[in-house]
Regions:
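Low-complexity repeat regions of mature extracellularly deployed or surface/particle-associated proteins
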Residues: 1-144
Length: 144
């Protein structure tokens, strides 16, 4: 999913296993985005990847974006941002989230079984990050 310009908003929902999600909201304005996933091995690409504080927040979103941050790359570039990620009772789901500039947020959740990974990089402006994880073997890395 690629969303350009002005008032932006997006909802991505995946039910099932072995899906791959990628989304970008670029070039500003009001942004938004909700990601709701139920199922296993989404964005997993047969593990292992990430690790150690979600691989140091996916190497600071691949060094502020020579791009490549993969494993369910979700990117908001500029303006008011926000993002909600919900993963429900699932295993082995991987997300790399980048908010580059403006008012930022990101909420999280990821509840249920385990081995889920999230890399969160918020580079520039007002930032925030709330996250809950439940289960075992989960990994979260945040860089601001």
């Amino acid at each position: 999913l690629w969303v350009d310009g002005k008032s932006n908003t997006a909802t991505l929902k995946a039910d099932g296993n072995d899906n791959r999600l990628r989304a970008q909201q670029r070039f500003g304005e009001n942004n938004g985005m909700t990601i709701d996933v139920t199922g296993n091995n989404n964005n997993d690409l047969s593990n292992p990847s990430f690790a150690g504080a979600a691989q140091a927040a996916r190497t600071d979103a691949n060094n502020a974006t020579g791009i490549l941050f993969r494993r369910g790359s979700v990117w908001q570039h500029g303006s008011e941002n926000e993002m909600t990620v919900i993963v429900d009772n699932s295993n082995n789901n991987d997300f790399a989230m980048l908010q580059q500039g403006s008012n930022n947020s990101i909420s999280g959740n990821i509840s249920g079984t385990g081995s889920n990974q999230a890399a969160v990089a918020q580079l520039g402006n007002n930032n925030s990050t709330n996250f809950n994880q439940s289960g075992s073997g989960n990994n979260l890395g945040v860089t601001q």
